[in-house]
């Protein structure tokens, strides 16, 4: 599993922010007595992908920094801090820093993202030379998406308000 992702320069990004207008501090909400929403997602990804390139991709906002640094250290995953509102720029900057051609988008509020779907999507994404790959065959909360760096760079120019991504 890991070899295919590595050979094709595909990284797994957990896209998350500590603050939310709808549910404040949702990333730190405890699922059980021991772990929070973000940790559950990391544990699921690490179980299937071992020490593969899993990155928490979040914003530079002050209350994000300490929270995610602690989790990154605890779980030995990279943490990338980028623009708060321009998520596409944050992702592009992270991909370029890590020398990736594609990334799997796993959102921080979808702790049940299906790791096996990631591999199937990745294979189809590469085989079909897609810029974007998704699935409708899974319930909400389980769906990963895959984007190419080339596709993001091409389409970022078409976005009217980059602060709403």
Region locations from a protein language model:
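Structural beta-sheet core signal
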Residues: 12-14, 56, 105
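Residues in the short beta-alpha loop(s) of Rossmann-like NAD(P)-binding domains
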Residues: 34, 41, 58-62
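Short phosphate-binding loop-to-helix
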Residues: 60-126
């Amino acid at each position: 599993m890991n070899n295919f992702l590595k050979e094709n320069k595909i990284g797994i990004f957990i896209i998350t922010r500590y603050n939310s207008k709808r549910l404040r501090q949702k990333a730190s909400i405890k699922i059980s007595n021991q772990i929070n929403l973000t940790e559950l997602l990391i544990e699921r990804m690490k179980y299937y992908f071992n020490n593969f390139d899993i990155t928490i991709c979040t914003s530079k906002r002050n209350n994000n920094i300490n929270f995610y640094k602690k989790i990154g250290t605890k779980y030995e995953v990279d943490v990338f801090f980028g623009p708060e509102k321009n998520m596409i720029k944050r992702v592009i900057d992270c991909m370029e820093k890590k020398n990736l051609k594609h990334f799997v988008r796993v959102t921080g509020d979808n702790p049940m993202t299906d790791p096996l779907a990631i591999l199937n999507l990745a294979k189809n994404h590469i085989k079909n030379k897609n810029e974007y790959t998704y699935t409708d065959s899974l319930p909400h909360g389980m769906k990963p998406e895959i984007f190419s760096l080339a596709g993001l760079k091409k389409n970022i120019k078409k976005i009217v308000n980059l602060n709403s991504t």
